[in-house]
Amino acid sequence: MSKTDLLIVESKNKVASIQKYVPEHFLVESCIGHFRELKKKNTKDGKGLGIDVANNFEPEFVISEEKLSVVKKLKALAKNKTIWIATDPDREGEAIGWHLKELLNIPKSQEKRITFSSITKKDINDAIEKPKPLDNNMAESAIARAIIDKLIGFTVSPLLHKTFNNWHLSGGRVQSVVLRLIIERETAVRDFKSTN
């Protein structure tokens, strides 16, 4: 039987298990996680951010060098097939699904997003019976997080290097806040005066 449907998962370790449970006309393949990243060279901003700050913080994505062969294979397999996106049911999985939609030019009307909590015939086939569109809000939150991480990390870290003449220092979206909380707590402990 010819394969008319392509179901894409994140992990290549899940491919064989899922292939056993899908209908015969399905082919299961992996995108091996994230395959696009924010551009680092020849960016519109000229700073290597891959974020066009002047254009509403528009991200510039490129295919990761190490994933070029995976992308080439997925594009070839996707020709004349119905595409099913079965990436992990979390924010990053939704972002990977969004990137797949963009890469494979899947129109909104043909989005088939499925999730399942366990790799069983019942769960997988129940999901296939009830596909839904991608959750663009969740995908956009992952993309926004990547943009914020890059904006903060690529601007704060060089400032720390220059200010303290120490190339081992870095700053980030989470790291900087956690460091401040630790310092505040340590200061409170040090300044504590017992009332006994």
Residue spans for each PLM region:
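Prokaryote-biased recognition of long, low-complexity C-terminal linker/tail segments
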Residues: 145-196
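Intrinsically disordered, low-complexity regulatory segments
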Residues: 1-155, 177
